[in-house]
Amino acid sequence: QVSEALNMASAYKGELIAKYGESGTCPTVVTDLGVDSFGAINSKYVHSIGLNSTYSGAVCAFEFTFNTVGMSSGVAGKKLIFAMMHYTGNGSARWECTSTEIRQLYLPSVCKGI
């Protein structure tokens, strides 16, 4: 279930990098990432995407909120954050994914231990 967000994140990472590369600032509204103003996503497991301005040390960040129905109790309604920690230019960046709400057991291996 969480891996669906990981797969979806690639497109949103690209949008965020492009916006940051153009303006030097983070998007301020989710429509800048190509989703509607409510952040709604047509997905089996992911309910919405939002911007996250509180992740410590991040240049920019976005987060997925998981659906509450038909989900593992360890994931239902919880958030997974993707944070751009360093913009290296030329369309690339260093990323972290993490969650303070989802136990390590449920996180994809690339998100564990962060």
Spans of features found by a protein language model:
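Membrane-proximal N-terminal amphipathic helix
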Residues: 1-25
